[in-house]
Amino acid sequence: MKKTSSFQNGLIWFGAAVSIAEILTGTYFAPLGFTKGLLAILLGHVIGCAMFFFAGLIGGRTGLSAMGTVELSFGRIGCLFFAALNVLQLVGWTSIMIYDGALATNTVLGIGKWVWCLVIGGLIVLWIAIGIKNLGWVNKIAMAALFILSIVLCVVVFRGGTPATVPDDSLSFGAAVELAVAMPLSWLPLISDYTREAEKPFAATLSSTLTYGVVSCWMYLIGMGAAIFTGEGDIALIMVKAGLGVAALLILILSTVTTTFLDAYSAGISAESLSKKINGKYAALIVTVIGTVCAICFPMDDITNFLYLIGSVFAPMIAIQITDFFLLRRGGARGKLDVCNAVVWVLGFVLYRVLMNVDIPVGNTLPDMAATMLLCVIAHKLFPDKARAA
């Protein structure tokens, strides 16, 4: 089997991080002001990327897909449950990314949002058809172009240097941290789909984590800077006013395609976990078509509640996986259902939703994960028999 290098994995996650969704999420941080906003972005990404790293390392060391690693901790039924939720969130992400990309490109060249949805959807289909292992030269060209164009965009946003907005209290620091955690958290059910095929699992996971973390912070910073220094939250409009033209189109289309490809591709892999009869590549193509249709038909302008929902589902899930694999070192399959871990996950999910009503400076994810990990350790010490397959 052809293995991927650490450099290739880094390129994949560079493409994932450069996205309109990340820039748009960054605009939400403007009410904090530049210094507090930057601190919230950095703190949130440190928390989120730590989980991202451990999730990827489990896949790299076991050679299992993301949902395969979930089965190690939750059993077959648990795997099916999270695989179904993951497919749903990835269909959602595919729709959101195509919607945002089409809306932005239509600002640059107004031929109709639905036309751009079809163009972007078609390019994602092409990416899937080429395949993750054959994207080498295509990815290198796309990433080089995105890197240069992102620098240009950064210069355009920050060259004014004078804030056009005044900080206010509409967003708390803790809520901002949670928005920063949410983006790397949303990739947790995907990263093992790529690190499992790495030549050097640890190096590839570290490369993926550092690349994604740094570039994602950069995208958030561009979004926040745009809102603070230009008073404009529409990145496409900023690029049009700066006269970027074709460069703007390239940024918007390439960033959308390279990110959304990962969503659709991993949706296909997760779908394979639901049934052996499902072909991952065909499933990914179907997800892309569904995402394109949804992007044409439905408005998707505010994704904050979607991000919080992802956090409440996957933060306690990865907390249990980390505890199982690295602390308790429980290896092997869990049969149909690991009842102990399933109950702990439900408690972790409920706790996250409760914590959403509490303003915590470090956000909800960190305390929720700490509590879930502690509950997991205690539960397996008190009820070792219940940890066996049900």
Residue ranges with predicted function:
Residues 115-157, 167-168, 205-212, 307-319, ...:
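Membrane-interface loop-to-helix entry segments
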Residues 78-111, 257-273:
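Hydrophobic transmembrane alpha-helices that form the core helical bundles
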Residues 111, 128, 135, 144-170, ...:
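Hydrophobic alpha-helical segments and their helix-loop junctions in multi-pass secondary transporters
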Residues 12-16, 82-87, 108-130, 144-154, ...:
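Transmembrane alpha-helical segments of multi-pass small-molecule transport proteins
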Residues 27-56, 78-80, 367, 371:
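Extracellular loop-to-transmembrane helix junctions
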Residues 319-390:
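C-terminal membrane-solvent junction of multi-pass transporters and transport-like membrane proteins
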Residues 1-28, 32-36, 48, 134, ...:
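Membrane-interface "cap" regions at the ends of multi-pass membrane proteins
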Residues 42-74, 81-87, 380-386:
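Juxtamembrane transmembrane-helix boundary signature
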